[in-house]
Amino acid sequence: MVINLSDQYSLLSNWVSELRSIQVQTDRMRFRRNLERIGEVAAFEISKVLEFEEKEIQTPLGISVCKVLKEQPVLATILRAGLPLHQGLLNYFDRADNAFISAYRKHNRDGSFEISLDYVSCPELEDRVVVIADPMLATGSSLVKTIQFLREEGHPKEIHIVVAIACTVGIEFVQRTEPNVKIWCGAIDEELTAKGYIVPGLGDAGDLAYGTKVQF
C-alpha cells in the first residue's frame, strides 16, 4: 500500500518544495527542519491506522474516558540521512523504542555500488509495529535489506516506511519483495537514473542535512 501525502493540498507540499529548491536547501538547519516536519505529518497520519484503547483518566473534577494509543511503535532509521525524519516521528511517538541501522551505498570505481549494512541497534521487534524513516526511496535496495535484517531480529506485525521523496521504480521493487508494508511518501517522482538517483528529486539528503561526506 502506498500513500502519497502530497495528493491532498497541505503545508507538507511547501516543505517538499523547499527541500527541492537549490536556493533554499543550502540552509542546513531549514533542510533538517523540513524533513522533521514531514516526519511529524507522517506520524500523525500513521497514528490514524494504529490500535487505540479506551482508558479512564482522572481529572481534577472527575473521570474522563479517553482513547489512547494501545502501544507505541518501534521507530527505526537508516543513518545518517534518516535522522531528521526520524526526529519528526519521535516528536509525536514520544515514548517509542528506537532502532538505528547503518546502511549505505558503497561505491565502486566503475560507478556501481553495493548496499553495505555495518551496524544495527534495535529493541525487541516481535509482534510490534515498526516505522522506518529514510528520506529517499530510490532503488529500494537499502530499505529492503534493512527490512530483511530487522525480520531476522523479530517478526513485526506491521511495517510502515516513511520517505520524503520516492521513485516509482523503488516503490515497485519494495512492493514486490515486501508486499505487506505500507509506504508513506511526501512526494513521488517518476525517473531514476542509471546511477540510482531520483529525478528531479532533491540531491543527496545526507549531505544537505549534515555536510558532504568522503567516500572510502
Residue ranges and their predicted role:
Residues 1-216:
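PRPP-associated nucleotide enzymes
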